[in-house]
């Protein structure tokens, strides 16, 4: 079941990739993918290229894939291990969701962080208290790690 679904998603992604994103298997293992997200233009991550890993569980799509950034990023909902705080990767997962939709949700999280549900409270505080400083640091990290 999982393999068929993953193969179908791969075909759909190759046929109609989401804007600013790409993804596909690492080598022959269809349960382990690498994804790329281009920093959205309306964000301090503009110009950056961010790499993520995607690991599908054997009971996919009934359980969400594990998605993590491998590129360092300054963001209140993404920690230094690359873990992403995003409801659809946890409690709000649904088998109707796809990798494509997950990547688009991560893109919109880059543009619109959720400082009220942070993985990195210090960054969330900076985002809320001093948006200019947040944007500056996010741009600096993007230039340092994602370009």
UniProtKB/Swiss-Prot annotation:
Listed EC numbers: 2.3.2.23
Alphabetical list of InterPro entries matching this protein: UBQ-conjugat_E2_core, UBQ-conjugating_AS, UBQ-conjugating_enzyme/RWD
Gene Ontology biological-process annotations: pronephric nephron tubule development; protein K48-linked ubiquitination; protein ubiquitination; ubiquitin-dependent protein catabolic process
Record has S-adenosyl-L-methionine as a keyword: no
Protein's job: Catalyzes the covalent attachment of ubiquitin to other proteins. Regulates pronephros development, possibly by promoting ubiquitination and thus inactivation or degradation of map3k10/mlk2.
PROSITE patterns hit by this protein: UBC_1 (PS00183), UBC_2 (PS50127)
Tissue-by-tissue expression: At embryonic stages 28 to 35, expressed in the somites, eye primordia, otic vesicle and branchial arches. By stage 35, also weakly expressed in the pronephros.
Similarity comment: family membership: Belongs to the ubiquitin-conjugating enzyme family.
Outcome after substituting residue 85 to A: Catalytically inactive. No effect on pronephros development
Gene (name only): ube2d4
Enzyme class, spelled out: transferase
Pfam families registered for this protein in UniProt: UQ_con
Keywords from the UniProt entry: ATP-binding, Developmental protein, Nucleotide-binding, Transferase, Ubl conjugation pathway
Top-rank taxon: Eukaryota
Pathway(s) the chain acts in: Protein modification; protein ubiquitination
Protein name: Ubiquitin-conjugating enzyme E2 D4
Domain UBC core residue range list: 1-147
Keyword DNA repair included in the entry's annotation: no
């Amino acid at each position: 079941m999982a393999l068929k679904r993953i193969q179908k998603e791969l075909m759909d992604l190759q046929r109609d990739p989401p804007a600013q994103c790409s993804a596909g298997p690492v080598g022959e293992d269809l349960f382990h993918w690498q994804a790329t997200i281009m920093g959205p233009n309306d964000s301090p991550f503009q110009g950056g290229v961010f790499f993520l890993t995607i690991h599908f569980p054997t009971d996919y799509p009934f359980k969400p894939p594990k998605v993590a950034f491998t590129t360092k990023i300054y963001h209140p909902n993404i920690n230094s291990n690359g873990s992403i705080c995003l409801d659809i990767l946890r409690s709000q997962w649904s088998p109707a969701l796809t990798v494509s939709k997950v990547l688009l949700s991560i893109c919109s999280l880059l543009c619109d962080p959720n400082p009220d549900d942070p993985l990195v409270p210090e960054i969330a505080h900076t985002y809320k208290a001093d948006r200019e400083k947040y944007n500056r640091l996010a741009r600096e990290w993007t230039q340092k790690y994602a370009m």
